[in-house]
């Protein structure tokens, strides 16, 4: 009977594979970033920074897994922020900031793409898409400065999706990192030249690792020209292990 069951499983799996699918045992970790974040954080009301909020996709995902999160969202693009205001301005405990975060305070040229999710402080590279519809000088603050101004002692989750600018965002949180006041970092890692001057993935990974963080998991990989294009990665400081 055991032999028959195994043979039947193999036949079914082979048939499914021929259709381009597979059957795998699901691990507890690494399947859904937001479920992993909820499990690690534990609190029902975490403090979250959503840097590169765009149209509020991450806000929506976080509110599905946390009953009452406090979310500080940052979106420097004018078109994207206007849309964000219309859809998310009345949500409780969500603060929308038309502001960029980087490594140091100042002003910097921002390239707004007609595809708002491709807007960046970096010019488009050979693997990027869309086109620049506007470029303007905008204010840049830092995670450290914002937390000081708003008396935020700790960040449970620092999420950054800023199209090649994520390393600068994390560098701007050096004070909190040194004080061990950030529990999780969730960011996009890019493998192709979507922007000019984008730092290589290993440089970002090394910087985060040097702050004492450890990788929880990579999540969905997206592909360009049959090569890895980008993915999201979650890091935890071992001080906050569950």
What are these regions (language model features)?
Residues 1-242:
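Phosphate/nucleotide-binding beta-alpha loop and adjacent structural elements of enzyme active sites
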């Amino acid at each position: 009977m055991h032999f028959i069951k195994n043979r039947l499983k193999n036949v079914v799996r082979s048939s499914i594979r021929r259709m381009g699918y597979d059957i795998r045992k699901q691990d507890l970790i690494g399947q859904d970033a937001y479920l992993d974040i909820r499990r690690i954080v534990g609190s029902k009301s975490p403090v979250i920074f959503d840097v590169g909020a765009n149209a509020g996709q991450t806000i929506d995902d976080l509110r599905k897994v946390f009953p009452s999160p406090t979310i500080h969202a940052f979106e420097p693009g004018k078109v994207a922020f206007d849309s964000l205001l219309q859809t998310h301005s009345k949500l409780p405990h969500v603060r929308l900031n038309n502001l960029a975060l980087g490594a140091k305070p100042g002003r910097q040229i921002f390239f707004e793409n007609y595809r708002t999710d491709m807007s960046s402080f970096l010019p488009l590279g050979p693997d990027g898409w869309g086109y620049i519809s506007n470029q303007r000088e905008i204010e840049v603050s830092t995670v450290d400065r914002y937390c000081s101004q708003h008396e935020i002692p700790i960040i449970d989750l620092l999420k950054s999706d800023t199209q090649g600018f994520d390393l600068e965002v994390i560098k701007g949180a050096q004070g909190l990192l040194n004080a061990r006041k950030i529990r999780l970092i969730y960011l996009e890692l890019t493998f192709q030249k979507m922007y000019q001057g984008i730092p290589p993935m290993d440089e970002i990974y090394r910087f985060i690792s040097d702050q004492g963080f450890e990788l929880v998991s990579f999540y969905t990989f997206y592909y360009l020209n049959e090569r890895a294009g980008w993915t999201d990665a979650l890091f935890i400081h071992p001080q906050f292990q569950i």
